[in-house]
Regions:
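Glycine-rich beta-strand-to-loop/alpha-helix junction loops that act as flexible
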Residues: 31-37, 118-122, 173
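A glycine- and small-aliphatic-rich helix-loop capping segment at beta-alpha/alpha-beta transitions
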Residues: 44-52, 77, 131-139
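Short, conserved loop/helix-junction motifs that constitute active-site signature segments
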Residues: 48-55, 135, 160-166, 194-198
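Ligand-binding beta-strand-loop-alpha-helix segment within the catalytic cores
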Residues: 51-117
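Class I SAM-dependent methyltransferase SAM-binding "motif I" and its flanking Rossmann-like core
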Residues: 115-118, 122-160
Length: 208
């Protein structure tokens, strides 16, 4: 795991945008994080008018009603603009177990992924893979998981699905993330270190 520190959050977001645009040029399938942190990157990507013929996956999804503004699909889709048409969403109209099985079969042909832009939580989670979660050791590609905040029920890509990805970038901004960055960079047994990729980076605005 390599860490690149930028002088400001804006500079780190610009770095993530450049990384993402470069990878979209050559990728057939990539993974995007939900949550607040990467949304400015997606909005900037939409403003660039980038055309991408491949498939985009969400790293995880919150178990809410389809179309709920709290879903990652809604928020990431709004930010991506026209590129939202490239998203392959989790099917929230099914049961969690049916959605897990459906998604697993759909993503299997795209393995290994070309890139993954992921987040990093204060306690070291990424996607909906939280420390101690049974999903970390799952032999499946997609799992039903439980998070600490509402909605607690989630669907998430597993380390098995994400391992083998060519390039993985964790975007972690703000002083609240500093300890998690340090722990991941030291190689502690946290979810980001369960993902085996050809190249892994953390982009941050924190000195570590």
């Amino acid at each position: 795991m390599r860490v690149k520190t930028f002088p400001s959050p804006q500079a780190a977001l610009a770095g993530a945008l450049a990384w993402l645009m470069e990878n979209l040029l050559y990728a057939s399938c990539g993974v995007l994080a939900g949550g607040e942190t990467p949304l400015p990157v997606y909005r900037a990507l939409a403003r660039q008018g980038v055309r991408y013929p491949g498939v985009l996956l969400l790293s995880d999804e919150r178990w809410l009603e389809p179309g709920d503004p709290g879903t990652n699909l809604y928020r990431v889709g709004q930010a991506l603009g026209p590129l939202r048409e490239r998203l392959l969403p989790f099917p929230l109209g099914l049961s969690p177990e049916q959605a897990r099985d459906w998604m697993e079969e759909r993503i299997r042909p795209f393995l290994p992924f070309d890139f993954a832009l992921l987040g990093l939580g204060e306690e070291g989670h990424t996607a909906s893979l939280f420390p101690g979660s049974p999903a970390l050791g799952s032999s499946r590609l997609v799992e039903v998981a439980v998070g600490p905040t509402y909605p607690s029920l989630r669907l998430t890509l597993t380390p098995k699905a994400l391992s083998g990805t060519r390039l993985v970038l964790f975007l972690a901004l703000g002083p609240a993330k500093r300890q998690a960055i340090l722990r991941v960079a030291r190689g502690e047994d946290l979810p980001p270190n369960r993902i085996r990729a050809e190249e892994k980076w953390i982009f941050t605005d924190q000195e570590v």
